[in-house]
């Protein structure tokens, strides 16, 4: 809960309501129904998974810190609140967001190196001319009004670890949940401290094993849905038998904190939806649809 978040451009300019985001996306569809009909794309969350996987590939080749990858994902989300994806080359946007995020998170990479590595993965979509990335960087900065500082939930997680006596396994699981929330609209909807608290609840209450965290997404989603309602019930019932002491401590802390409990539950439900739809994810399908769109509209030029 970094104090400077409350005065940040992130809080003042880059938090939306669900209704506002839906209106933005609907306006894109209304303005260009032909493109939406000609180039159907998967659910936004499935695209987010695909973009995240591409960023991870790029980041691994350059030993990039997770926070830079997270910042890149936020940049992509912000950019696409101003631009219809069907009028862009998403591979260039992903590469540019990565390049810019590395600079902002103080782990800069040379532009020629970034372009070369991106071409190793997507040679048909990334031109060898580095000026293309430079132009896209200018557009990205302009669309975000030069508001490039991103506050992440990782810091709050670290701050709450001793206060809530979180084990190393719980911290690792909460970290994974925070990573996953970037695959949803949550970074555009809620403050980072709310996301961090949600991640801690998932780690402490549901304790999904890391090996099956995504492999059994549907059962996990059901467990999380039930668990989320149990937490809500516990907060409203101070006299019942209640949950185990470990969870009681967390519930007690939540009840006494100034954290918006309803927002935490809504974030948990959004994560449930992500894990449910994850079962339908196909990297090949996303790649084919995006590739057809980029090539047909000559967006790779």
From Swiss-Prot:
The keyword Nucleus applies. GO terms for molecular function: cyclin-dependent protein serine/threonine kinase regulator activity. Residues 53-142 form the Cyclin N-terminal domain. SUPFAM superfamilies: Cyclin-like. GO terms for biological process: regulation of transcription by RNA polymerase II. It comes from the Eukaryota. Gene3D superfamilies: Cyclin-like. It is found in: Nucleus. InterPro entries: Cyclin-like_dom, Cyclin-like_sf, Cyclin/Ssn8, Cyclin_N. It holds the Pfam family Cyclin_N. Keywords: Activator, Cyclin, Nucleus, Repressor, Transcription, Transcription regulation. GO terms for cellular component: nucleus. CDD domains: CYCLIN_CCNC_rpt1 (cd20513). Coiled coil: none annotated. Component of the srb8-11 complex. The srb8-11 complex is a regulatory module of the Mediator complex which is itself involved in regulation of basal and activated RNA polymerase II-dependent transcription. The srb8-11 complex may be involved in the transcriptional repression of a subset of genes regulated by Mediator. It may inhibit the association of the Mediator complex with RNA polymerase II to form the holoenzyme complex. The srb8-11 complex phosphorylates the C-terminal domain (CTD) of the largest subunit of RNA polymerase II. Component of the srb8-11 complex, a regulatory module of the Mediator complex. Belongs to the cyclin family. Cyclin C subfamily. PANTHER family: CYCLIN (PTHR10026). This is RNA polymerase II holoenzyme cyclin-like subunit. It comes from Aspergillus oryzae (strain ATCC 42149 / RIB 40).
